[in-house]
């Protein structure tokens, strides 16, 4: 019975060595793998992710509405300008938009609502995936609601600047003299909050896929900025990081709407200043093939 002891000890030693070797290999493998969780950017806002989940729509087909098969096509009406007029109009439009700046000092002077109606109507002419028009523009005029919006945003923005955004981002913003204090959310007579609808609903209650919803709404935002500039108003593009869910509840918006952008709108205050920034010349932004 005793002669088996050395054999058992040897077997146990071999087993222990094998376990440690495999443990070392496992650790080396983990070190070589990309650290997706550790390196995840803390400033990525879930509300800003495009949610055109086509696979989910296919799997849950009974919950989703099929699109219309037939849409009437009509003759297209078009203004064909002479070349000189085209050049003139394009140059004038460029000069108008080249004056657009991000203005953080906005007066409390009231803006005609008809103008706001028109600029949002203009934004609604944007193209969209399968003509789903996946946007909702919430116009806030009530001072109490504006102040609640400011409170929510400043609470989250302080955390963003102190923790989420990181040293590099905060350093890059120093030259623009921005911080988490957003006084313009109180002073601007109008706040426009632009929501993307990640899906829609048909009359029968079934869901409708909104293809490329974030790209579509982003195009609408660009047109809205141009329309505001054309009307003689100023704004600053604001993307309230991690504020979407709270603002959605405050404004009574449904869960399938996600906040994409907030625009304070009004006239510049008398003491308004902007950074003396230069835009890239054409040869740095255009490539002709």
Curated annotation (Swiss-Prot):
BP-aspect Gene Ontology terms: thyroid hormone metabolic process; tyrosine metabolic process
Tissue: Expressed at a high level in thyroid gland (at protein level). Expressed at a high level in thyroid gland and at lower level in kidney and trachea.
Chain segments annotated as transmembrane: 1-21
Protein name: Iodotyrosine deiodinase 1
Assembly notes: Homodimer.
Gene from which this protein is expressed: IYD
GO cellular component term of the entry, any: plasma membrane
Cofactor section: FMN
